[in-house]
């Protein structure tokens, strides 16, 4: 198992976002703004879904990595730290998924 974490990736996204857009894909996406980054996130999500549906495990692994990376870029642009997302996941997993979903529908 790798010791690499989403927090590590978040730090890399932060560092690379400060580079020149001509030298870094991350900086280029951040400079292009949320519409471009969100579009790329959507494209990667579709590619991951297609890999899952076709049962292509290798491609799904590759696309899942792309999806996580682009999600962190979108969060960076929105100034939402990964810590906030993890706190929300922790809150949700404190109860059953069905109960949590029902509580969202009633609010």
Swiss-Prot record:
Disulfide bond residue pairs: none
GO biological process: L-histidine biosynthetic process
Compartments (UniProt record): Cytoplasm
Keyword Ubl conjugation: no
GO terms for MF: ATP binding; phosphoribosyl-ATP diphosphatase activity
Pathway: Amino-acid biosynthesis; L-histidine biosynthesis; L-histidine from 5-phospho-alpha-D-ribose 1-diphosphate: step 2/9
GO cellular component, one term: cytoplasm
CDD domains: NTP-PPase_HisIE_like
Source taxon at top rank: Bacteria
Presence of the UniProt keyword Isomerase in the record: no
EC nos: 3.6.1.31
UniProt keywords, alphabetically: Amino-acid biosynthesis, ATP-binding, Cytoplasm, Histidine biosynthesis, Hydrolase, Nucleotide-binding
Reaction(s) the record says it catalyses: 1-(5-phospho-beta-D-ribosyl)-ATP + H2O = 1-(5-phospho-beta-D-ribosyl)-5'-AMP + diphosphate + H(+)
Protein family (similarity comment): Belongs to the PRA-PH family.
Record protein name field: Phosphoribosyl-ATP pyrophosphatase
């Amino acid at each position: 198992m790798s010791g690499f974490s989403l927090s590590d990736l978040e730090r890399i996204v932060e560092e690379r976002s400060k580079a020149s857009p001509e030298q870094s894909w991350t900086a280029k996406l951040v400079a292009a703004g949320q519409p471009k980054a969100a579009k790329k996130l959507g494209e990667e999500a579709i590619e991951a879904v297609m890999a899952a549906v076709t049962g292509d495990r290798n491609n799904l692994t590759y696309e899942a990595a792309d999806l996580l990376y682009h999600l962190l870029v979108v969060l960076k642009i929105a100034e939402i730290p990964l810590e906030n997302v993890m706190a929300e996941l922790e809150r949700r997993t404190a109860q059953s998924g069905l109960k949590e979903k029902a509580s969202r529908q009633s609010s």
